[in-house]
């Protein structure tokens, strides 16, 4: 199976994207922009990238293709996806972000942005159709490396400026924060922003070899490493992100990661959001805990953004969205503490990190205390890697076909009281435990999300769910 659009962007094997596929899709994107009148011939198109080995070459291939299509490519270098999107909004320019986000190192991807933000599902279909039409065009598929004017400093600085005045200069004073740098494009930017608000930042775990970090399914080895750092350095928190810095990672003082949907909820409270858009996989306690209107969507930023756009069209103000991975999106303009935060409808890791740290400082309590204050159902998630797309699709289809199939497969866990198939299949067992399975849209993986009343019950349910799914012969 070749590269295809997943939950956010085009994804595929790096060996496939380093070649004609990237040229083809960059050309198709240019054609869509021109055909729809979103840009004029000769328009600027920004290109950014993460630190994967293949990203620089894919970016160069895309820049050459953009130039052949009549665009003017601008090289923004290695920077966070939200930084690229923000700079694109400032310039009124479309953009391409070369990143595979959190997926394994042998894969990569391309995220596409219109001048006002991330493309939607209809745009993805249009780009795919144009790519099919252009696939036999030698010019559209030509592989050559191009260049663009260097705007890396301008784009990065503009993103840092967004958060410079969000908190007082001493807003994080007194915190000793570990920064797990690995191969995140935000590793130096986070240092600048956190130190700018008074935090003592200690870098750990920097790597020149790409390390995929999935903030929604943190490995046991990574959790052990985080806990060891927290103890060794007496950190108040450890912060990090995935590869392209649109998903945050934040731990408490023990090195225990905070759930991404909790970070989103904290952010919503800090900014006094009036409407939250979030996928069905986010914690079921969000509605009660937030006290505001919550719109549930399918998994994927395009669906969350569509819900925010619809809410703004209805006249709603202070609209924001977040996913279970912690990426926060602002659908409308916000203000906080005298600072303005213009809308940025793409996932961002910095805002939720700052929000949670600031809440801890203001409450004069460790982050573990902030978690306890929110009293959400205990939610965990995991995944089965190298789970073929066709196998996961067949499994979900089998389960959706009849209640008997569901009961047969999950009888060892308990009696299923209800199901929801908005995205994958969500099972509610008698007693209120929840198990949600869905195929990943980005990699050959099967995702499993659970909720229960206490940590032990949640861990047991997750282990049971993964065991059942692993042994399924469907």
Curated annotation (Swiss-Prot):
GO terms for molecular function: magnesium ion binding; phosphomannomutase activity. InterPro entries: A-D-PHexomutase_a/b/a-I (IPR005844), A-D-PHexomutase_a/b/a-I/II/III (IPR016055), A-D-PHexomutase_a/b/a-II (IPR005845), A-D-PHexomutase_a/b/a-III (IPR005846), A-D-PHexomutase_C (IPR005843), A-D-PHexomutase_C_sf (IPR036900), A-D-PHexomutase_CS (IPR016066), Phosphoglucosamine_mutase (IPR050060). The active site is at residue 101. One of its GO terms (biological process) is carbohydrate metabolic process. It catalyses: alpha-D-mannose 1-phosphate = D-mannose 6-phosphate. Pfam families: PGM_PMM_I, PGM_PMM_II, PGM_PMM_III, PGM_PMM_IV. It is an enzyme of class 5 (isomerase). The keyword Phosphoprotein applies. Gene3D superfamilies: Alpha-D-Glucose-1,6-Bisphosphate, subunit A, domain 3, Alpha-D-phosphohexomutase, C-terminal domain. Its EC number is 5.4.2.8. Binds 1 Mg(2+) ion per subunit. Mg(2+) binds at residues 101, 242, 244, 246. The keyword Iron does not apply. Its cofactor is Mg(2+). PANTHER family: PHOSPHOGLUCOMUTASE (ALPHA-D-GLUCOSE-1,6-BISPHOSPHATE-DEPENDENT) (PTHR42946:SF1), PHOSPHOHEXOSE MUTASE (PTHR42946). Belongs to the phosphohexose mutase family. This is Phosphomannomutase. It comes from Sinorhizobium fredii (strain NBRC 101917 / NGR234).
């Amino acid at each position: 199976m070749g590269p295809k659009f997943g939950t956010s962007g085009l994804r595929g094997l790096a060996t496939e994207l380093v070649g004609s596929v990237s040229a083809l899709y960059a050309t198709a994107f240019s054609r869509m922009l021109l055909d729809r009148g979103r840009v004029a011939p000769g328009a600027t198109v920004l290109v950014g990238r993460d630190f994967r080995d293949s990203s620089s070459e894919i970016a160069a291939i895309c820049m050459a293709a953009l130039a052949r299509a009549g665009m003017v490519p601008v090289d923004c270098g290695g920077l966070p996806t939200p930084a690229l999107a923000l700079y694109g909004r400032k310039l009124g320019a479309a953009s391409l972000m070369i990143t595979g986000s959190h997926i394994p190192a042998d894969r990569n991807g391309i995220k596409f942005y219109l001048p006002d933000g991330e493309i939607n599902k209809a745009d993805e279909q249009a780009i795919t159709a144009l790519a099919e039409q252009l696939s036999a065009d030698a010019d559209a598929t030509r592989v050559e490396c191009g260049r663009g004017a260097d705007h890396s400093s301008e784009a990065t600085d503009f993103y840092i400026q967004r958060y410079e005045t969000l908190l007082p200069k001493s807003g994080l004073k007194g915190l000793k924060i570990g920064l797990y740098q690995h191969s995140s494009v935000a590793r130096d930017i986070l240092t600048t922003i956190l130190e700018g608000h008074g935090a003592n930042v200690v870098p750990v775990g920097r790597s020149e070899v790409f390390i995929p970090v999935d903030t929604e399914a943190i490995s046991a080895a990574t959790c052990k490493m985080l806990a060891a750092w927290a103890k060794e350095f007496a950190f108040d928190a450890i912060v990090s992100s995935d590869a392209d810095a649109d998903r945050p990672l934040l731990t408490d003082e023990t090195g225990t990661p905070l759930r991404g949907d909790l970070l989103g909820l904290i952010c919503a409270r800090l900014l006094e959001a009036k409407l939250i858009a979030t996928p069905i996989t986010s914690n079921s306690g969000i509605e009660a805990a937030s006290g505001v209107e919550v719109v549930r969507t399918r998994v994927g930023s395009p669906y969350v953004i569509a819900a925010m756009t619809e809410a703004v069209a209805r006249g709603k103000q202070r609209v924001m969205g977040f996913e279970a991975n912690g990426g926060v999106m602002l659908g409308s303009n916000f203000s906080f503490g005298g600072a303005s935060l213009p809308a940025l409808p793409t996932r961002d890791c910095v805002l939720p990190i700052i929000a949670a740290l600031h809440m801890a400082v203001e409450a004069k309590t460790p982050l573990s205390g902030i978690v306890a204050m929110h009293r959400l159902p205990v939610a965990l998630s995991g995944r089965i890697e190298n789970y073929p797309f066709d196998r996961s699709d067949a499994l979900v289809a089998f389960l959706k076909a009849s209640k008997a199939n569901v009961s047969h497969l999950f009888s060892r866990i308990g009696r299923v009281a209800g199901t929801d198939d908005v995205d994958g299949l969500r099972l509610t067992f008698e007693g209120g435990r929840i198990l949600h399975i869905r195929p990943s849209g980005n990699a050959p993986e099967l995702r499993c999300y659970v909720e229960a009343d206490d940590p032990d019950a949640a861990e047991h349910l997750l282990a049971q769910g993964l065991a059942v799914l692993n042994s399924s012969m469907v």
